[in-house]
């Protein structure tokens, strides 16, 4: 069903039985939000980010095979995986976080994804990432963490299918530690093993074994890896990734080795954000679920999870995260939408936990229950999908007045011109610096989004507003599934 605008300022819920089951469509201030359509398109965007040999069922007609020789420099097949954003580099840390959060969405909202017909697409998106990471982790005590030269890549504006820039390879090992990425990859493998446990037991077991080995590598050879700087520097250190990985490994194995780590070794912290670089809040909410299920000695994690909510929730006396006049949380310019979708998902997941156990959160003298958390999560998603002062969607190809100039190489270069013999400087003149809509629609991409005053510039060269990222979408999938199937 197409998105369309209606009249009136009341909220109308229309439950329609369509091809894929129940679809929830909401009218907010005259704009109808088709959550099922947004969910479908969110997953299509992830397909647009695929690297390697594309499958026959590829749903993005303007994408083709790319980077088939990745890893050749180190005699390892490193084809596959995802490009993180609008460029053609494969960064291990944000890619692994993309897979972990997509797996979490799929585990938490499996029933809703099945009801909306998107469960298999979500699993396929996860497997595209885990297949790649299995290649990256094919050698003992070593993990390949990046393919491509970001400095060279950023000097050229070319489709991945036609790129000529170097495909250099970076790695971590027991000799060159990189605790953040090793632990994040362990988390991705562990979470994904749960997704495939009852679908492909052999594959799930393989993922879990890799998760255990990588966690051991991360924990035994501690050190921050800065090879991806200045593009994906870990500013938060590695303690959050270690907690995150241990939490997922405990969920996947119920082995008390990982629970013991969380109780006696882990170093946690009070935070107000959840992102590819800062995982504490996600782990704290997962651990809070364990507390409600009867686990002892973990109370600090619940205090920290509650603090995360109190820091973000308007109306809380401890509210500290800036909210725009239009109601969107804003932590910093540059892919701010990642914090919007991440916070929405954590609030949604925590709301489910609170509702199941009939619990509330106390922020000083104020108490909040699951309905408060879910209302805030929904408001953040609705903002992205069109309920905002600009009256426009920030998802490409969806809703009212969606963006046309995503900062994205593949989307902006016309297929029939892609083989033009242009130098890198001229590629920017030809395809980057023109104020025209992209030649190819980057369907489903949630862009960086507006600034602190709800202002947005739909221009390719204003990347802080218009660049998409896989981890913005991956973590939106769960809450979109919940809203679509409500």
From Swiss-Prot:
- Catalytic activity field: Endohydrolysis of (1->4)-beta-D-glucosidic linkages in cellulose, lichenin and cereal beta-D-glucans
Keyword list (alphabetical) reads: Carbohydrate metabolism, Cell wall biogenesis/degradation, Cellulose degradation, Glycoprotein, Glycosidase, Hydrolase, Polysaccharide degradation, Secreted, Signal
InterPro entries annotated for this entry?
6-hairpin_glycosidase_sf, 6hp_glycosidase-like_sf, Glyco_hydro_9, Glyco_hydro_9_His_AS
Q: Which residues are glycosylated?
A: 29
Q: Where is the signal peptide?
A: 1-30
Q: What is its main location?
A: secreted
Gene Ontology biological process terms in this record:
cell wall organization; cellulose catabolic process
Q: Which residues form the active site?
A: 87 (nucleophile), 407, 458, 467
Q: Which domain of life is it from?
A: Eukaryota
Q: Where in the cell is it found?
A: Secreted
Q: Which cellular component appears as one GO term in the record?
A: extracellular region
Molecular function, one GO term: cellulase activity
Keyword Thylakoid present in the record's keywords: the answer is no
Q: What is its EC number?
A: 3.2.1.4
- UniProt record similarity statement: Belongs to the glycosyl hydrolase 9 (cellulase E) family.
Name of this protein: Endoglucanase 16
Q: Which organism is it from?
A: Arabidopsis thaliana
């Amino acid at each position: 069903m197409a998105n369309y605008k209606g009249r009136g300022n009341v909220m109308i819920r229309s439950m329609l039985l369509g091809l894929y089951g129940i679809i929830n469509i909401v009218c907010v201030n005259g704009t109808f939000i088709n959550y099922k359509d947004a969910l479908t398109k969110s997953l299509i965007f992830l397909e647009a980010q695929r690297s390697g040999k594309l499958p026959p069922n590829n749903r993005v007609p303007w994408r083709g095979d790319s980077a088939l020789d990745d890893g050749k420099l180190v005699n390892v097949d490193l084809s596959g995986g995802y490009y993180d954003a609008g460029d053609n580099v494969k960064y291990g840390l944000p890619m692994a976080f993309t897979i972990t959060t997509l797996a979490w969405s799929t585990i938490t909202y499996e029933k809703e994804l099945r009801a909306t017909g998107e469960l298999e697409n979500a699993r396929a998106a996860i497997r595209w990432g885990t297949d790649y990471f299995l290649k990256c982790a094919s050698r003992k005590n070593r993990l390949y963490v990046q393919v491509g030269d970001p400095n060279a890549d950023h000097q050229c504006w070319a489709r991945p299918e036609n790129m000529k820039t170097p495909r250099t390879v970076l790695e971590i090992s027991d000799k060159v530690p990189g605790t953040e990425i090793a632990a994040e990859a362990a988390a991705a493998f562990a979470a994904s093993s749960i997704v495939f446990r009852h679908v492909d037991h052999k594959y799930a077991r393989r993922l879990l074994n890799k998760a255990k080995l990588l966690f051991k590598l991360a924990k035994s050879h501690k050190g921050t890896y800065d090879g991806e700087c200045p593009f994906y520097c870990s500013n938060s250190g590695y303690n959050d990734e270690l907690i995150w990985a241990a939490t997922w490994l405990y969920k996947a194995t119920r082995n008390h080795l990982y629970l013991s780590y969380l109780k006696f070794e882990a170093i946690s912290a009070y935070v107000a954000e959840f992102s590819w670089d800062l995982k504490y809040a996600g782990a704290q909410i997962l651990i809070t679920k364990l507390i409600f299920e009867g686990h002892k000695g973990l109370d600090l994690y619940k205090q920290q999870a509650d603090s995360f909510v109190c820091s973000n929730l308007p109306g809380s006396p401890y509210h500290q995260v800036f909210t725009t006049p239009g109601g969107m949380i804003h932590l910093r310019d540059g892919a701010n939408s990642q914090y919007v979708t991440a916070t929405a998902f954590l609030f949604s997941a925590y709301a489910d936990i609170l509702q199941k156990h009939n619990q509330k959160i106390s922020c000083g003298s104020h108490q909040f229950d699951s309905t408060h958390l879910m209302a805030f999560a929904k408001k953040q998603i609705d903002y992205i999908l069109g309920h905002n002062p600009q009256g426009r969607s920030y998802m490409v190809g969806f809703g009212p007045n969606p963006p046309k100039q995503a900062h994205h190489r593949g989307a902006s270069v016309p297929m029939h011109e892609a083989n033009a013999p242009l130098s890198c400087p001229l590629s920017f003149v030809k395809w980057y610096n023109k104020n025209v809509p992209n030649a190819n629609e980057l369907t489903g991409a949630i862009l960086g989004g507006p600034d602190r005053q709800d202002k947005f510039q739909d221009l390719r060269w204003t990347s802080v507003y218009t660049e998409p990222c896989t981890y913005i979408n991956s973590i939106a999938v769960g809450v979109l599934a919940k809203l679509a199937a409500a």
